[in-house]
Amino acid sequence: MQLSDVRRAFQADLPTVVIVTLNAPRASDSPFAAPVAPPRLMADCNANVVAAMKEFGVRKTVILQAFGVGDSWVNLHCVLRLLMKTSNMSYQYDDHNETEREVRASGVDYVMVRPSRLVETEDATLPIKVWPDHGKGVPLMASTSRLSVARWLVDAAEGTEWDNSAPVITN
């Protein structure tokens, strides 16, 4: 995503908040598959979003990340940390961490949500538990429905309760 593309999108319909749900693609759906995206896909795209936000006076971005990024790394179960460090998933975690560092330093308001293991469900009534940025206490097999994540992203965009934080969420 080039800065010129983001500018065109902003010119067409100026947002008040930007929600970013990028994920770096892999060669297959397997989490162990080789990455096919540039190493900084998410960081560079978010940098372009932040640059356009500053140009157009947009103050807030809400970014989908993953449990284990940033401060939550130390509270990710040790088996999962080993998996994330030694598999091809490490590239995405590196990219997420670069995104976090750069967005935090940019001066824009942000919410970086870190759901635990994503699952499919049609149940729109599942409660969402919000954990602190460090994710201390999140159970090993905790999961978050994609539907819950989508709902939470919109709620975070519309409110201010989670501004300038990076909470972990689960169902």
Residue ranges of model-derived segments:
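Oxidoreductase cofactor-interface core, primarily capturing Rossmann-like NAD(P)-dependent enzymes
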Residues: P25, P38-P39, E55-F56, K60, ...
